[in-house]
Amino acid sequence: SFFAEDLCVITDSVSNNTMIDTSQSEAVLLCDLNDHQVLYNKNSTEQLNPASLTKVMTAIIALKYGNLDDMLTASSNVTIQESGASLVGISPGDTMTLSQALHALLIASGNDAAVMIAEYISGSVDQFVELMNTEALELGATNCHFMNPHGLTQDAHYVTAYDMYLIFNEAIKYDEFIQIISSNEYTGVYHDAQGEPKELSLKSTNNFINGNHSVPGGVVVIGGKTGTTSAAGNCLVLLSKDSYGNPYISVILKCTQRDYLYDEMYDLIATVNQS
């Protein structure tokens, strides 16, 4: 398989560091991107709900096929009623650039922004979802299946931690993606249907970026994507670097509580300087 050349591959030979407590997380993966080594693997091929980690796939397609300066117009489908769904406040008729929509998608996890991007790229959410599944397969992510561009709970919408690594590994090839996920805050101005200005004010949902959780000494967290729903639990995919600047991707799916998510991810990435 041509995928294996520059990718981490799951083998039976991974001996997990027993000092790392991942008891509260269903699936955990740590990959060394330089040596293409899997350093920690727990249930990384189990199919689980990704929640908003889905938005990484949405971002890849936007960056691959879209133009950052293009102006997007929101349809009535940006009005999402589901309780607890994170929204940045986009209303039907609002216009913003693709760059602004990507910031809303990745920093504040805006589900409304996800719909706006999907309709801009493909004309409809359903057609965009077909593209998500096609593109995922092209990345070798063969054990995941998407039903929407945002990750709100839906039957037959799932990923594996390993597929999430493959998808995130593709996303970080885009400079704009890295710039956005590393941002704690973003402000911009977009416009409503009448052309009146609206403020876009975003704050990172990632506690390693927004300062709500400390980062291990000798480790730099570049950024990542959070995901939280009752079905998915607490999820996080992260790009970090060790004290030599070598990059790592770490994934946790279905952690029981947000505090445990960051504690277990902290323990996981703290080990990168020991290898």
Summary of predicted features, one role per range:
Residues 2-162, 166-175:
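Active-site-adjacent loops and short helices of periplasmic peptidoglycan-processing enzymes
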Residues 2-27, 124-275:
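Penicillin-recognizing serine hydrolase domain
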